[in-house]
A protein has these predicted regions:
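Extended, charge-rich alpha-helical interface modules
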Residues: 1-86
């Protein structure tokens, strides 16, 4: 189970990294075009909505990563240890 969790963790970290990079690029684009009028205001509004959704998803991904890390690092109780302590 631990190996499966480590694989899941790696996939989540990869997805979160990719999403964070896209967020940074979108933020940079929005910042650069904040006062330029070469883009339709409706497009800017939609990009800001997209950014909000992406940020929410990124937050959820990072929370899932932390939960999975804790699960992977949680000490395991061995059945033999339980029998010895009884």
């Amino acid at each position: 189970m631990t190996k499966e969790n480590e694989i899941r963790l790696a996939k989540l970290e990869n997805e979160a990294g990719t999403l964070d990079l896209k967020l940074a690029k979108l933020d940079q684009f929005l910042f650069e075009h904040k006062y330029k009028y070469d883009i339709n205001p409706e497009e800017i509004r939609l990009m800001k909505a997209q950014r909000t959704i992406m940020f929410s998803y990124s937050t959820v991904l990072h929370e899932r990563i932390e939960v999975l890390r804790k699960e992977i690092n949680k000490p395991r109780i061995n059945a033999d240890d339980v029998m010895l302590n009884s």
